[in-house]
Amino acid sequence: MRISTRIVASLVVVGALATASPAQAVVVPRHAINVCQSASFYDNYDSASGPYGLKRVLEYGNKVGHTPGAHPVYNGWAATFDFGPNDWGYMRIECIGGYDSW
């Protein structure tokens, strides 16, 4: 690859990154726990039909993460991080509590 081609390719990548939307900024989830006896943890949420793709059922005390005001809540279903298997999903907002307890 010639040097001029490398420079052009680098400039194209830099230009694409400069025009990318900053709305996808990563916010670290605030430590919390599941405060319900059990809580369904779903893969995703659809505004028309609600949550779908049951991943697992969380027990009381499972370590989760959610940052109020930064992570979305749709009709009571909150985007939540499950620190056990380290993945994102949706659970009921009223089952998230004990913030900063661990």
Predicted feature residues:
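N-terminal prepro-regions of secreted/extracellular proteins
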Residues: 1-32
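Short, functionally important structural connectors and interaction interfaces within domains
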Residues: 9-11, 50, 83
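General "foldedness" signal
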Residues: 15-17, 21-22, 55, 61, ...
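Beta-loop motif signature
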Residues: 29-75
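Secreted/processed peptides and extracellular or luminal domains of membrane proteins
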Residues: 42, 101-102
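SH3/SH3-like beta-barrel superfamily modules
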Residues: 58-101
